[in-house]
């Protein structure tokens, strides 16, 4: 059924055709299926960025317009010109609002989803932290011993009633027990340190010694005892030549370790001196980095004497063939002056680390040790005499003297200079029967019970 009405504005024809903007006439069917969707798409794109929000009245008008359009298509009848134009105008006003409202709704929905997720995430993190602090840090340890056996048995029964799935998870008290165990070990170590500090303070108080104000001591009595000991060692060395024999035997055992260009070494001179070391300026102080748990004695030592050893050997020239020639060498090295600060203290073996695996002896780890070392600011003066050659001899070559002095100082630093120490195990002072002795009496007369014949 065709419409007999003609639009007043010239856009609608009598036969039900529509005149577009360029003057072309199209049918209503083509307008609804082709031109109208394109027009709506353009309106949708323009309405993404502007337009008021959609109201309920706009939605109702859009629904009425859609229903009227469907009726027009089904009946193939156009409404009166004024009504249809009004519907088109309402459509042009309603669709941009609908599109803009939809886009605004989607934007607000996405913004709200992001804010909601952020808030939920922050709240979940806070809850996890609160749970961890409450149950893992401030909870009581389950490893405490319970004096009531009935409670222990009931707790055992309750634990046995748990399912295997719940037992597979680590209990929060597990971490708490580990933390408490470490805290107990640290507390025990602190108690031991406090006990040592208390013992040191007690000793200083009962011996009337103030580490801060006590003057340094001269150690004259100690010098006398050391002098007697050294004199006894010298007498034994002079009479029996024990030191020379032991040194030669030691060199013979180490002969295989000598380089191929050296012949056997022999001791020709040994001088153990005539004077004695002087110990002075002794002061007791706390050991560094001990926090008052250990005492040590600082003693100045001064030795002005001649300690000499002389050797002879041959330098073998093995080129172009072995034993082509040999060069005799005689060297005498003397220490004429030694000054240093000696550190002496009592300690245990477990307080220090050995420098080599060979020095570890499990039998010597018990008991106390006398530890001594020298400060790095020591002074050691040498006097070296050298003689090279058989007929044409070279005397006192400086290079030989410097080489010998370097090796001696290197040996001394690696063994006795801080931070290296030397340990001497102290014997047990507890009275024992095998250590009991008595003086030997001189017998002038013959033994009793034995007859004397004249």
From Swiss-Prot:
<feature type="compositionally biased region" description="Basic and acidic residues">
    <location>
        <begin position="435"/>
        <end position="454"/>
    </location>
</feature>
<feature type="topological domain" description="Lumenal">
    <location>
        <begin position="1"/>
        <end position="117"/>
    </location>
</feature>
<dbReference type="InterPro" id="IPR027537">
    <property type="entry name" value="Mmm1"/>
</dbReference>
<dbReference type="Pfam" id="PF10296">
    <property type="entry name" value="MMM1"/>
</dbReference>
<keyword id="KW-0812">Transmembrane</keyword>
<dbReference type="GO" id="GO:0000002">
    <property type="term" value="P:mitochondrial genome maintenance"/>
</dbReference>
<feature type="region of interest" description="Disordered">
    <location>
        <begin position="434"/>
        <end position="454"/>
    </location>
</feature>
<dbReference type="GO" id="GO:0032865">
    <property type="term" value="C:ERMES complex"/>
</dbReference>
<comment type="subunit">
    <text>Homodimer. Component of the ER-mitochondria encounter structure (ERMES) or MDM complex, composed of MMM1, MDM10, MDM12 and MDM34. A MMM1 homodimer associates with one molecule of MDM12 on each side in a pairwise head-to-tail manner, and the SMP-LTD domains of MMM1 and MDM12 generate a continuous hydrophobic tunnel for phospholipid trafficking.</text>
</comment>
<feature type="binding site" description="in other chain">
    <location>
        <position position="411"/>
    </location>
    <ligand>
        <name>a 1,2-diacyl-sn-glycero-3-phosphate</name>
    </ligand>
</feature>
<feature type="binding site">
    <location>
        <position position="430"/>
    </location>
    <ligand>
        <name>a 1,2-diacyl-sn-glycero-3-phosphate</name>
    </ligand>
</feature>
<feature type="topological domain" description="Cytoplasmic">
    <location>
        <begin position="139"/>
        <end position="454"/>
    </location>
</feature>
<feature type="binding site" description="in other chain">
    <location>
        <position position="415"/>
    </location>
    <ligand>
        <name>a 1,2-diacyl-sn-glycero-3-phosphate</name>
    </ligand>
</feature>
<feature type="binding site" description="in other chain">
    <location>
        <position position="253"/>
    </location>
    <ligand>
        <name>a 1,2-diacyl-sn-glycero-3-phosphate</name>
    </ligand>
</feature>
<dbReference type="GO" id="GO:0006869">
    <property type="term" value="P:lipid transport"/>
</dbReference>
<keyword id="KW-0446">Lipid-binding</keyword>
<keyword id="KW-0472">Membrane</keyword>
<feature type="region of interest" description="Disordered">
    <location>
        <begin position="144"/>
        <end position="164"/>
    </location>
</feature>
<feature type="binding site">
    <location>
        <position position="433"/>
    </location>
    <ligand>
        <name>a 1,2-diacyl-sn-glycero-3-phosphate</name>
    </ligand>
</feature>
<comment type="function">
    <text>Component of the ERMES/MDM complex, which serves as a molecular tether to connect the endoplasmic reticulum (ER) and mitochondria. Components of this complex are involved in the control of mitochondrial shape and protein biogenesis, and function in nonvesicular lipid trafficking between the ER and mitochondria. Preferentially binds to glycerophospholipids such as phosphatidylcholoine (PC), phosphatidic acid (PA), phosphatidylglycerol (PG), and phosphatidylserine (PS), but not to phosphatidylethanolamine (PE).</text>
</comment>
<dbReference type="GO" id="GO:0045040">
    <property type="term" value="P:protein insertion into mitochondrial outer membrane"/>
</dbReference>
<keyword id="KW-0256">Endoplasmic reticulum</keyword>
<protein>
    <recommendedName>
        <fullName>Maintenance of mitochondrial morphology protein 1</fullName>
    </recommendedName>
</protein>
<comment type="similarity">
    <text>Belongs to the MMM1 family.</text>
</comment>
<dbReference type="GO" id="GO:0005789">
    <property type="term" value="C:endoplasmic reticulum membrane"/>
</dbReference>
<dbReference type="GO" id="GO:0008289">
    <property type="term" value="F:lipid binding"/>
</dbReference>
<keyword id="KW-1133">Transmembrane helix</keyword>
<keyword id="KW-0445">Lipid transport</keyword>
<feature type="transmembrane region" description="Helical">
    <location>
        <begin position="118"/>
        <end position="138"/>
    </location>
</feature>
<keyword id="KW-0813">Transport</keyword>
<feature type="domain" description="SMP-LTD">
    <location>
        <begin position="215"/>
        <end position="427"/>
    </location>
</feature>
<dbReference type="InterPro" id="IPR031468">
    <property type="entry name" value="SMP_LBD"/>
</dbReference>
<dbReference type="InterPro" id="IPR019411">
    <property type="entry name" value="MMM1_dom"/>
</dbReference>
<feature type="compositionally biased region" description="Low complexity">
    <location>
        <begin position="153"/>
        <end position="164"/>
    </location>
</feature>
<feature type="binding site">
    <location>
        <position position="432"/>
    </location>
    <ligand>
        <name>a 1,2-diacyl-sn-glycero-3-phosphate</name>
    </ligand>
</feature>
């Amino acid at each position: 059924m065709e419409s007999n009405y003609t639009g007043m504005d010239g856009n609608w024809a009598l036969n039900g055709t529509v005149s577009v903007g360029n003057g072309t006439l199209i049918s209503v069917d083509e307008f609804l299926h082709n031109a109208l969707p394109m027009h709506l798409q353009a309106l949708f794109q323009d309405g993404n960025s502007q337009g008021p929000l959609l109201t309920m009245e706009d939605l109702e008008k859009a629904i009425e317009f859609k229903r009227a359009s469907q009726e027009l298509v089904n009946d193939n009848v156009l409404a009166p010109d004024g009504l249809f134009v009004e519907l088109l105008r309402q459509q042009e006003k309603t669709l941009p609002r609908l599109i803009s409202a939809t886009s605004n709704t989607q934007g607000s929905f996405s913004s709200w989803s992001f804010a909601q997720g952020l808030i939920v995430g922050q709240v979940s993190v806070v809850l996890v932290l609160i749970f961890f602090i409450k149950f893992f840090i401030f909870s009581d340890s389950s490893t405490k011993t319970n004096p009531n056996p009935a409670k222990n048995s009931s707790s055992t029964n309750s634990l046995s009633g748990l399912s295997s799935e719940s037992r597979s998870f680590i209990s929060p008290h597990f971490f708490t027990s580990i933390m408490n165990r470490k805290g107990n070990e640290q507390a025990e170590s602190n108690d031991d340190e406090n006990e040592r500090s208390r013992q040191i303070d007690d000793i200083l108080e009962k011996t009337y010694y103030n580490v801060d104000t006590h003057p340094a001591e001269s150690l004259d009595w100690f010098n006398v005892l050391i002098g007697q000991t050294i004199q006894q060692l010298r007498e034994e060395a002079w009479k029996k030549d024990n030191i020379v024999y032991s040194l030669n035997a030691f060199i013979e055992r180490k002969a295989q370790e000598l380089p191929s260009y050296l012949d056997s070494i022999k001791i020709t001179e040994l001088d153990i001196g005539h004077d004695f070391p002087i110990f002075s300026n002794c002061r007791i102080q706390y050991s560094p980095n001990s926090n008052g748990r250990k005492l040590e004695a600082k003693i100045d030592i001064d030795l002005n004497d001649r300690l000499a050893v002389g050797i002879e050997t041959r330098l073998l020239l093995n080129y172009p063939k072995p034993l082509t020639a040999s060069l005799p060498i005689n060297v005498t090295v003397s220490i004429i002056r030694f000054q240093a600060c000696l550190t002496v203290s009592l300690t245990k073996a477990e307080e220090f680390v050995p420098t080599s695996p060979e020095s570890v002896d499990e039998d010597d780890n018990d008991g106390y040790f006398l530890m001594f070392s020298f400060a790095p600011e020591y002074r050691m003066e040498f006097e070296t005499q050298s003689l090279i050659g058989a007929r044409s001899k070279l005397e006192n070559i400086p290079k030989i003297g410097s080489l010998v002095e370097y090796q001696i100082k290197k040996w001394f630093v690696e063994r006795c200079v801080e931070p290296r120490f030397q340990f001497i195990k102290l014997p047990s002072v507890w009275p024992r029967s095998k250590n009991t002795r008595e003086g030997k009496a001189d017998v002038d007369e013959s033994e009793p019970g034995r007859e004397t014949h004249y």
